[in-house]
Amino acid sequence: MNTQNQIKENIEIEHFTSDESEKLGFPFSDATIVDNIIYVSGQVGNRPGTTELISGGIGPETTQALNNIKSIINQLGSSSEDIFKCLCMLSDINDYSEMNQAYRMFFDEVKKPSRSTFAGSGLALGAKIEIECWAVKK
């Protein structure tokens, strides 16, 4: 038997959508779990269960996006300590420094995950930041 096929047969894929996100009807899952890795979809700084962005700019939006990620991985039995990679997408690279301040505070008590950051335009809901994360499922 081909090893690649054997590996594919043993991979489990699970899709997770929170009750709050389910109400919004987005065409994607909050997270996809492949074996023991959680891939969290891009999160913006919206209030859970709404499309309303938190006010105050990049700092509060960053904190809220990370709290949204934390909520998702907590519901899956993991914690912020289990996050090992983040991808931050900014609508304006000039927000990099202020985003870093909020990001640093969020990960202050845990080991900081590896991260990539870039800027583009047209983020979902008009957000200033969107963050994807990968975490180990406990």
Regions from the language model: what does each represent?
Residues M1-N67, S71-E81, L90-K138:
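N-terminal presequence-like segments and the immediate start of the first folded domain
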